[in-house]
């Protein structure tokens, strides 16, 4: 049983504030939702279950029941998930405010314990204190959180997450922030709450508290493309494709870590809720993560023998050649930018091979083929530099005055020629390693300039950042006909 979900269900009946704040999709009537994919903890109701993707950030972090409310930890609306979400540097005062919010929403005192006990004992078989019937009382106040890093910003989603030992397929990792607070003070707060419970429940409460307040923080995970909705991958090769996200917004205007203070003034809180609205954003999928995904797919289709060939056709337009014809049916070629990069890269490398090595036909076996296979994987800069260096050395460079040089005296296409003129100022006949690296980078950067890309897509922006971009007409820029530089 999910303790946090049960606590929200029972405490929602206490008063008007709780009824508004503690409303969860997991406790309401189920509605059809998208298919679930991975195992993990729903950030909204904190239960461990099968997760589907959030409509606000497209990351898998919400269960099929809670997905009906489309809540995201990046929203600009004072729902419970947003008020439990803290960002970057967290102070002791911030944690104090969080604990006060917990005490306000989930109080334990003699009156409340007696009230719930009377309701539960109305049935003749419920005289004993069974944990499953009093589960809502067994949620201690801890500083347990799930954290995630999104392009330099670290988000902490506090809650009470059961079954921490289970498999976690999400990009969130368990973080214990008790070191930023006073351990003895937190113990005292929980012991005071526990004192109002019957003895049998006190023991279970204590066990849960110490297990969730003394655990070791996990190593933070790196977010991967598999953590995002599969719908993105299905359409990623369309240059006109945009990501559609839904955000819950309001007239809330507080510092990020102060959202939990809003319930202190109930009238002001309900005024903010009246301004709640849903906003839709169309966002470009342009980011380093998705670019690397597309380039990796293209890399798997590479036919390295083309660099030794005499074909007059571009690398993607060779037909009826056993060694050079690529699979043109792959969806990756729907993106004309990938095709342009592929053609220009291999036109340039072929010119280098023909200028420096004695090769006559694409059927020949050359050592340089191994280095060419991953030449598109520029997102991993260090590995890519090593790869290009190996390729350069296999071209049998001539050493003069501690520098190595190779020749360039074979024909190149107009696109590559323009790159050479723009980067070096002319079409050179002699190149160094740094020249080759520079030219290959420019060919790729002309369409996919990863130097200025975020690692994750803009779906992980806060609402304020999305609004700022919309004012500049930038978030939904289509990619057709323009490069990332433009």
From Swiss-Prot:
**Matching InterPro entries:** Rotavirus_NSP1
Q: Name one GO cellular component term.
A: host cytoskeleton
Among its keywords, does the record have Metal-binding? yes
Question: Motif range for pLxIS motif?
Answer: 480-483
- PTM (free text): The C-terminal region is phosphorylated by host CKII/CSNK2A1. Phosphorylation of the DSGXS motif is essential for host NF-kappa-B inhibition.
The molecular function GO annotations come to:
metal ion binding; RNA binding
Q: Which GO terms describe its biological process?
A: symbiont-mediated suppression of host cytoplasmic pattern recognition receptor signaling pathway via inhibition of IRF3 activity; symbiont-mediated suppression of host cytoplasmic pattern recognition receptor signaling pathway via inhibition of IRF7 activity; symbiont-mediated suppression of host NF-kappaB cascade
Q: Where is this region: Interaction with host IRF3?
A: 317-486
Positions of region (Zinc-binding domain)? 42-79
Which positions does the motif IKBKB-like degron (ILD) motif occupy? 479-483
Q: Where is this region: Important for cytoskeleton localization?
A: 82-176
Which is an annotated Pfam family here? Rota_NS53
**Locations listed in the record:** Host cytoplasm, Host cytoskeleton
Q: How does it assemble?
A: Interacts (via C-terminus) with host IRF3; this interaction leads to IRF3 degradation. Interacts with host IRF7; this interaction leads to IRF7 degradation. Interacts with host CUL1 and CUL3. Interacts with host BTRC.
Domain note: The integrity of the zinc-binding domain in NSP1 is important for degradation of host IRF3. The pLxIS motif targets host IRF3 for degradation; however phosphorylation of NSP1 pLxIS motif is not required for its activity.
* Name this polypeptide is given: Non-structural protein 1
Q: Which organism is it from?
A: Rotavirus A (strain RVA/Human/Philippines/L26/1987/G12P1B[4]) (RV-A)
């Amino acid at each position: 049983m999910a303790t946090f979900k049960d606590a929200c269900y029972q405490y929602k009946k206490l008063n008007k504030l709780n009824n508004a704040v503690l409303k969860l999709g997991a406790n309401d009537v189920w509605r059809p939702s998208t298919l679930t994919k991975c195992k993990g903890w729903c950030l909204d109701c904190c239960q461990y279950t099968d997760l589907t993707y959030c409509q606000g950030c497209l990351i898998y972090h919400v269960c099929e029941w809670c997905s009906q409310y489309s809540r995201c930890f990046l929203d600009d609306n004072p729902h419970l998930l947003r008020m439990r979400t803290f960002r970057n540097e967290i102070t002791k005062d911030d944690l104090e405010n969080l604990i006060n919010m917990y005490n306000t929403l989930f109080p334990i005192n003699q009156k409340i314990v007696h009230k719930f006990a009377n309701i539960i004992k109305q049935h003749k078989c419920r005289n004993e204190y069974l944990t499953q019937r009093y589960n809502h009382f067994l949620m201690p106040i801890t500083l347990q959180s799930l954290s995630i890093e999104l392009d330099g910003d670290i988000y902490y989603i506090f809650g009470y997450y059961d079954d921490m030992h289970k498999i976690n397929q999400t990009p969130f990792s368990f973080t214990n922030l008790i070191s930023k607070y006073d351990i003895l003070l937190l113990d005292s707060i929980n012991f005071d709450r526990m004192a109002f419970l019957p003895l049998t429940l006190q023991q279970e409460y204590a066990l849960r508290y110490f297990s969730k307040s003394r655990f070791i923080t996990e190593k933070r995970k790196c977010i991967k493309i598999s953590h995002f909705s599969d719908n993105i991958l299905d359409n990623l090769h369309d240059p006109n494709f945009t990501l559609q996200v839904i955000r819950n917004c309001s007239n809330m205007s507080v510092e990020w870590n102060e959202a939990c203070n809003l319930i202190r003034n109930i009238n002001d809180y309900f005024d903010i809720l009246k301004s709640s609205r849903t906003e839709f954003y169309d966002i470009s999928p342009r980011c380093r993560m998705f670019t690397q995904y597309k380039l990796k797919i293209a890399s798997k289709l590479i036919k390295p023998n083309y660099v030794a060939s005499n074909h007059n056709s571009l690398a993607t337009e060779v037909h009826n050649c056993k060694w050079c014809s690529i699979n043109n049916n792959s969806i990756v070629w729907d993106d004309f930018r990938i095709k342009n990069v592929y053609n220009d890269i291999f036109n340039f490398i072929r010119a280098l091979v023909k200028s420096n090595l004695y090769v006559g036909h694409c059927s020949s076996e050359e050592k340089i083929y191994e280095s060419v296979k991953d030449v598109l994987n520029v997102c991993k800069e260090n590995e890519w530099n090593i790869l290009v260096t190996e390729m350069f050395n296999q071209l049998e460079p001539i050493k003069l005055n501690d520098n190595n040089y190779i020749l360039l005296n074979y024909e190149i296409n107009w696109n590559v020629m323009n790159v050479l003129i723009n980067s070096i100022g002319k079409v050179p006949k002699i190149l160094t390693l740094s020249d080759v690296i520079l030219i290959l980078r420019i060919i790729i950067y002309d369409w996919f300039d990863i130097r200025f890309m975020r690692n994750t897509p803009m779906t992980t922006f806060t609402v304020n950042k999305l609004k700022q971009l919309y004012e500049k007409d930038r978030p939904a820029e289509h990619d057709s006909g323009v490069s990332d530089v433009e």
